[in-house]
């Protein structure tokens, strides 16, 4: 027994370390290499905020990123708002936290939903999103692709008024016009105007109307099976809380001996970061801490790819039409397959299917052994 203990406590010799080094290739450091390169390069994120005036869009952005992007903003009178057309304003700021740099771009849409006639008031916004896709497509197709500036909109926070009974026609029109182009995250603005039971009813009504009108809002990705239980629980809470009921505030008030951001009312204090009062913390966690990269991935892999495929299809169609017009020899349509050819194709498909099934059975047998 004592010999075994002495053997277990034996220190590794230089020869043992050399043997370990020989077995170690080194590609396990790839995540660290990617991390260092990404941190050095920095990250960029473009967030669009949309909704009618007075719903606290700029205040919420300030609360999310602790950065004032609207220092030079001019407040318009009621008459100016009615006559104002929809504008697109960009605010860009560089934020650094613990050595990680983020280039944040906020795309604001003043004038949206404020006119008497709001027919297709979302057209300038959809045009802007398409213009960013077009610019990225041109840069990607050019000769110099090393430093492409990504100005594509990665997420749109759409503010819904808490004073209605669900979605208004302008809300439905906006989201249906953009849901195939950008990740839409609907928010119930100024949640402190409602009691908890009213918030629950409004959330349920909005979810029903989103399904009814076929609106595709941003869907949270499913958790992997190897994720820990805390992350799975957080993911479930996010999905159950959508659409998020939010409150924004730039004012620091004192509550229970602590200084917190919130709003002071005669009946009490509403704390922005108190999850019993609103979903601000859930929105911040989703947008910044857990799903920012997924929002960028969906923008690139789904929305932009759809736009890119459409552009390539149009270009191919135009080239085909031009070649038909310029060709001295008429291009005949391809002959339709006869019955014998179709029969042969079906036989080949059936043969291929049988081979695939046989390979699948062999693979299963090998796994069982």
Curated annotation (Swiss-Prot):
Organism field: Homo sapiens
Xref: Gene3D superfamilies: P-loop containing nucleotide triphosphate hydrolases (3.40.50.300)
Name this polypeptide is given: Septin-5
Keyword Lyase included in the entry's annotation: no
One Gene Ontology term of the molecular function aspect: structural molecule activity
Family: Belongs to the TRAFAC class TrmE-Era-EngA-EngB-Septin-like GTPase superfamily. Septin GTPase family.
Lineage, highest ranks first: Eukaryota, Metazoa, Chordata, Craniata, Vertebrata
Domain Septin-type G: 41-314
Protein keywords: Cell cycle, Cell division, Coiled coil, Cytoplasm, Cytoskeleton, GTP-binding, Methylation, Nucleotide-binding, Phosphoprotein
Pfam families cross-referenced by the UniProt entry: Septin
Modification(s) after translation: Phosphorylated by DYRK1A. In platelets, phosphorylated in response to thrombin, phorbol-12-myristate-13-acetate and collagen.
More about this protein: In a heterologous system, SEPTIN5 overexpression has been shown to exert dopamine-dependent neurotoxicity. As wild-type PRKN, but not familial-linked PRKN mutants, ubiquitinates mouse SEPTIN5 and promotes its degradation, it has been suggested that a deficiency in SEPTIN5 degradation may contribute to the development of early onset Parkinson disease 2 (PARK2).
